[in-house]
């Protein structure tokens, strides 16, 4: 199967995050950051930019091509907004409820909440929260619960933070912070089918499952007694990515620097359903397909991007998961960000957004 490169853009800063808007197949955001040379303050060295893009409809594209003799493929998606920051963007997630909300976590500890205006086609800031962090600590990842009223964030000191969001998204309050990992907590994620359960992965090579009810009842005055996870699995290398299946309960995908993808059944945690062969690089992002339940896509650092799927004759058997299609396209650097567009009605017009780091490359792949 031959991939189609819909479009390629080279951005101002190094790119690390791509997220499609859940309610329009053609709208997506890309997060970037830059380390400024010569600055001695670790956190102050980063600056960032958030881009909002729109993929042009086919008729609009044909009109543009006819009106421009020197057209090039950069016209196939266009920048409609950018926002500059004095801090690097390290992760973003859309809230999947109908409020059109995007959460953005940045290196210095800012947690920004934006609302997408579908008429004006722009992001509007609803709230900006300064997370209390020491100067050498970075915010690394975030995730929303399914209800859209809580967020979790992970940090480079191994901590995880739980945050409550008001109904109008004007205020974010930290409810709990706990020591989850001995080193960087690279990733955190909610269980979308049980909002009292969250997952985390860290550079201490551990995948952990936490019960929020237990955590909220944990006495922080018990100095030296950390909260206890429901489950801990030690991996060969650092755990870098986790994504809960959006429609199948108890199914979790976990990626690691060891280059292998593991699928876990939460009802049977003795061993994973499958541990894949090497995907060619550390698995930095995993995204389940929003509608085709037997597929996911990965960004594998030095190994490019891969779609994995189960046997088409037995799509529910995740032990058959294997690479269906791979993509490098124009990308010459570390594959960090990836996401599916939300086209429920026509999978032939399904887009995958991909970004890579040092080459500052963003592309749209049609599998």
From Swiss-Prot:
PANTHER family listed in its UniProt record: DIPHTHINE METHYLTRANSFERASE
Metabolic or biological pathway, per its Swiss-Prot or TrEMBL entry: Protein modification; peptidyl-diphthamide biosynthesis
Gene Ontology molecular functions: diphthine methylesterase activity
Described function: Catalyzes the demethylation of diphthine methyl ester to form diphthine, an intermediate diphthamide biosynthesis, a post-translational modification of histidine which occurs in translation elongation factor 2 (efbA).
UniProt-recorded name of the protein: Diphthine methyltransferase homolog
The UniProt record lists the keyword Magnesium: no
Source organism (scientific name): Dictyostelium discoideum
Keyword terms, alphabetized: Hydrolase, Repeat, WD repeat
UniProt enzyme class: hydrolase
Domain of life of the organism encoding this protein: Eukaryota
Example GO BP: protein histidyl modification to diphthamide
SUPFAM superfamilies the UniProt entry points to: WD40 repeat-like
Pfam families in the record: WD40
Residue windows of the WD repeats: 84-124, 132-173, 180-220, 234-274
Known EC number: 3.1.1.97
InterPro entries linked: Diphthine_MTase, WD40/YVTN_repeat-like_dom_sf, WD40_repeat_dom_sf, WD40_rpt
Any one cellular-component term (Gene Ontology): cytoplasm
Catalytic activity: diphthine methyl ester-[translation elongation factor 2] + H2O = diphthine-[translation elongation factor 2] + methanol + H(+)
Family: Belongs to the DPH7 family.
């Amino acid at each position: 199967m031959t991939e189609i490169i819909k479009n390629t853009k080279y951005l101002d800063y190094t790119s690390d995050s791509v997220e499609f808007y859940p309610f329009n197949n053609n709208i997506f955001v890309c997060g970037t950051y830059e380390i400024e040379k010569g600055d001695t303050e670790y956190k102050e060295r980063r600056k960032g930019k958030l881009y909002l893009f729109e993929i042009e409809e086919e008729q609009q594209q044909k009109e543009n091509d006819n009106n421009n003799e020197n057209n090039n493929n950069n016209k196939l998606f266009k920048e409609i907004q950018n926002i500059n920051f004095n801090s690097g963007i390290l992760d973003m997630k859309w809230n999947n409820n109908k409020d059109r909300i995007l959460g953005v976590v940045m290196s210095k500890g800012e947690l920004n909440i934006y609302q997408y205006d579908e008429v004006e086609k722009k992001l509007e800031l609803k709230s900006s929260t300064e997370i209390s962090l020491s100067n050498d600590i970075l915010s690394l990842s975030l995730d929303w619960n399914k209800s859209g009223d809580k967020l979790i964030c992970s940090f480079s000191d191994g901590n995880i933070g739980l945050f409550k969001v008001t109904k109008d998204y004007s205020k974010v309050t930290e409810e709990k912070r706990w020591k989850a990992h001995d080193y960087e907590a690279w990733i955190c994620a909610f269980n979308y089918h049980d909002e009292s359960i969250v997952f985390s992965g860290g550079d201490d090579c551990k995948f952990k499952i936490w019960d929020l009810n237990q955590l909220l009842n944990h006495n922080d005055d018990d100095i030296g007694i950390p909260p206890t996870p429901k489950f801990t699995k030690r991996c060969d290398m650092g755990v870098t990515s986790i994504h809960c299946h959006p429609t199948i309960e108890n199914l979790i995908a976990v990626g690691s620097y060891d280059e292998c993808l593991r699928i876990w059944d939460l009802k049977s945690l003795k061993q994973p359903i499958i541990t894949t062969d090497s995907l060619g690089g550390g698995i930095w992002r995993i995204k389940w397909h929003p509608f085709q339940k037997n597929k996911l896509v990965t960004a594998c650092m030095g190994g490019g991007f891969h779609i994995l799927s189960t046997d088409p004759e037995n799509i529910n058997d995740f032990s058959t998961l294997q690479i269906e299609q791979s993509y490098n396209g124009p990308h010459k650097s570390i594959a960090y960000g990836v996401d599916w567009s939300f086209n429920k009605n026509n999978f032939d017009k399904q887009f995958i957004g991909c970004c890579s780091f040092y080459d500052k490359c963003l592309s749209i792949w049609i599998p």
